[in-house]
Regions:
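Glycine-rich phosphate/pyrophosphate-binding loop and the adjoining helix
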Residues: 1-2, 72-116
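Helix-loop-strand module that forms the ligand-binding subsite of alpha/beta enzymes
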Residues: 1-72, 77-78
Length: 116
């Protein structure tokens, strides 16, 4: 795996990630595990969109994948969530946008540290 870091994003459906994101995690996790832990010591961050509730369990689902795969998860100023129902509404979530920007700064910092 050439990437030094991975960001997985998903909408929140019924307090969990989308079926597509779950399939990616399940398949990539198995392939990684069966081939010597391909994601070990790489950076990973979860980014979720939610209408209202249920985003924290979805956020956890992605982070469990990273942590079980021995990945390094950078923090931010809050959970990496954006709130909105219709397309474009998440962009109006000022706290969510700030959290994402802070995550980007922290991810870039971590990638530089891990690379060296």
């Amino acid at each position: 795996i050439e990437a030094d870091g991975i960001i997985i994003g998903s909408p929140t459906y019924f307090s969990n990630i989308s079926t597509e994101a779950k399939a990616l995690i399940d398949r990539a996790g198995l392939v990684s595990r069966m081939n010597g832990d391909l994601f070990k010591r790489k950076a990973g961050a979860a980014v979720l969109a939610a209408r209202r509730g249920g985003a924290v369990p979805a956020f956890s689902a992605v982070n469990y994948f990273f942590l079980i795969g021995q990945m390094i998860v950078p923090g931010s100023t809050y959970w990496n969530l954006g709130y909105g129902m219709d397309p474009g509404e998440v962009e109006k979530d000022e706290e969510g946008i700030k959290t994402m920007k802070d995550l980007g700064v922290n991810m870039a910092w971590l990638l530089k540290k891990v690379k060296n």
